[in-house]
Amino acid sequence: MENLTLVIPAKNEGSCLPQVLDELKKFECKKLIIVDKNDIGTISAIENKNCEILKQKTSGYGNALIEGINHVKTPFMCIFNADGSFDPKYLSEMLNKIVEENNDFIFASRYLQNAGSDDDTFITLLGNKIFSFIGNLFFKF
């Protein structure tokens, strides 16, 4: 998986990001952490981990994604959460699928059949269903 870069935006994630990076050690891919330039706690927590740290020029999650994506040099990338909410065991499967089926991109969702999340409540699920339905009315692919 050396042809894959994980783009990991992080802000105030010094307490959990080191464990996420430890879990990602077994995957031979690049780990690009985009950190708010003033977030000394996160930077110091991960500076000895096997990752590249990119300090954001402009603040905000969207800007972190843009700056990170613009920095990627590998043919494939994955936007990965810094808080450990994604299970990396699916990375190989998703990368194989994109290569074998010649896809341009893949979306993963915890709301697909046989997927889920431990932190979803009934209200969260109901709200997501309603907003997805409304979004599909206007932006159906």
Where are the language model's segments positioned?
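Short, well-formed alpha-helical segments that are part of the catalytic scaffolds
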Residues: N12-K26
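Donor nucleotide-sugar binding loop of glycosyltransferases
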Residues: E13-C16, N38, Y61, D87
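Cell-envelope/extracellular polymer assembly enzymes that use nucleotide-activated donors
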Residues: N3-T5
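Short, structured coil segments at secondary-structure junctions
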Residues: F27, N48-N50
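Acceptor/aglycone-binding surface of glycosyltransferases and processive sugar-polymer synthases
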Residues: K57-S59, N63-N70, F76-I79, P88-F141
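A conserved acidic beta->alpha catalytic loop
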Residues: V35-I43
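Hydrophobic/aromatic residues located in beta-strands of well-ordered beta-sheets
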Residues: K31-I33, F105
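Active-site acidic Asp-centered loop
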Residues: D36-K37, F80-A82
